[in-house]
């Protein structure tokens, strides 16, 4: 299947790349179907809306720069995506790329959680106070000795 994307024009995708956000992203609740695309620039991925080519998010695996990242998610929140085990889950942090000179940040307070088995997903909100919406990715990589 071909889709139009914001960043890469026309792209061929496979069914396995399609995810369904059961409630949409916060602020974009009306959009539910997305494709998870390789950005071509590791370690980032695109989450591209299938309904609006101008709606796309950059995401990253938060464990790459915060190996101590922990999610305390209530089992009730996992029911809509039918997750049976933590092993079934993929976790991504949404990335913000600001104007030049400002750090690239990741939202660790509102991660994207995907059930690998059925491709259902949701955006969680972590309220433990440890994580915030603007973690400096480069500073965190340097602190973790991974850059």
UniProtKB/Swiss-Prot annotation:
Q: Please identify the protein, giving its name as recorded.
A: Flagellar assembly factor FliW
Q: What is the name of the gene encoding this protein?
A: fliW
Subcellular localization(s) per the UniProt record: Cytoplasm
Under PANTHER family, the record lists: FLAGELLAR ASSEMBLY FACTOR FLIW (PTHR39190:SF1)
* Lineage of source species: Bacteria, Pseudomonadati, Spirochaetota, Spirochaetia, Spirochaetales
**Entry keyword Cytoplasm:** yes
Q: How does it assemble?
A: Interacts with translational regulator CsrA and flagellin(s).
Q: Give the function comment from the record.
A: Acts as an anti-CsrA protein, binds CsrA and prevents it from repressing translation of its target genes, one of which is flagellin. Binds to flagellin and participates in the assembly of the flagellum.
Task: State the SUPFAM superfamilies in the record.
Answer: BH3618-like
InterPro entries from the UniProt entry: Flagellar_assembly_factor_FliW, Flagellar_assmbl_FliW_dom_sf
- An example of a Pfam family matching this protein is FliW
A GO biological-process term: regulation of translation
Q: Which domain of life is it from?
A: Bacteria
Write out the coiled-coil annotation as residue ranges.
Answer: none
Family classification: Belongs to the FliW family.
């Amino acid at each position: 299947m071909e889709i139009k994307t914001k960043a890469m024009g026309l792209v061929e995708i496979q069914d396995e790349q399609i995810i369904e956000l059961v409630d949409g992203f916060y602020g974009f609740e009306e959009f539910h179907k997305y494709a998870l695309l390789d950005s071509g620039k590791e370690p980032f991925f695109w989450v591209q809306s299938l309904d609006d080519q101008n709606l796309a998010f950059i995401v990253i695996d938060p464990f790459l720069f915060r190996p101590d990242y922990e999610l305390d998610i209530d089992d009730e929140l996992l029911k809509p995506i039918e997750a049976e085990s933590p092993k079934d889950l993929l976790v991504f942090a949404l990335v913000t790329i600001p104007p030049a000179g400002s750090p690239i940040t990741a939202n660790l307070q509102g991660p994207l959680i995907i059930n690998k088995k059925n491709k259902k997903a949701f955006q969680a909100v972590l309220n433990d106070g440890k994580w915030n919406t603007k973690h400096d990715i480069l500073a965190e990589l340097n602190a973790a000795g991974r850059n």
